[in-house]
Regions:
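Conserved short hydrophobic interaction patches
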Residues: 31, 35, 73, 77, ...
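Conserved long alpha-helical elements within nucleotide-processing catalytic cores of c-di-GMP signaling
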Residues: 10-34, 47-51, 55, 61-68, ...
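A short glycine-enriched loop-to-beta-strand structural element that forms part of the catalytic core
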Residues: 48, 82-131, 143-149
Length: 172
């Protein structure tokens, strides 16, 4: 599962307006769909879960190539959504929530990838995917990040301690 989100989208939406913001969301959806069709298989699926959040469901052997294609394409395509001045500067100068004017990077695509190997809950999937997406968003630019923990639903081996505890006869 790949959880995709747009970085710096609020600043773009506030600066360029909701209509242009909707175009950026549509651009992201189109690029993710293209990457899924180009690098995935017939079982791959894309879902828009709201706002600027998307979920791709694909086989592990496809999801990295899909994410790589999507982030590369989005990096090129998003530049066309900015005025010449912002595009050349590589950022947008806008007033933040704190009332201070500052420079914000262009919108970028961050993707967190998790793997599922067996039964698990939707809560576990959502929490882990959100955690890895947050990690991806902490890096600058258009990036994807894999969860390095064991896949969700995988059975972790339980250590076996042979002769670790004496039998009652041995203890006596």
């Amino acid at each position: 599962i790949a959880y995709a989100d747009l970085d710096n989208f609020k600043v773009y939406n506030d600066t360029y307006g909701f209509k242009n913001g909707d175009r950026v969301i549509k651009l992201a959806a189109d690029i993710l769909d293209w990457a899924m069709r180009k690098r995935g298989d017939a079982a791959s699926r894309l879902f828009h879960i709201g706002g600027d959040d998307f979920v791709l469901i694909a086989k592990p052997e496809h999801v990295e190539r899909m994410s790589q294609a999507a982030t590369r394409c989005f990096k090129r395509a998003i530049r066309g959504c900015y005025c010449t001045q912002d595009r050349e500067r590589g950022s947008v100068v806008a007033t933040g929530r704190d009332g201070v004017e500052r420079s914000y990077p262009l919108v970028s695509l961050s993707i967190g990838i998790i793997e599922i190997a067996g039964p698990c809950t939707l809560m576990e999937i959502g929490e882990r995917a959100a955690h890895v997406k947050k990690y991806a968003k902490s890096m600058p630019g258009n990036v994807f990040a894999w969860d390095r923990r064991p896949p969700l639903g995988s059975v972790q081996p339980v250590p076996v301690f042979i002769n670790a505890c004496p039998t009652p006869e041995e203890a006596a």
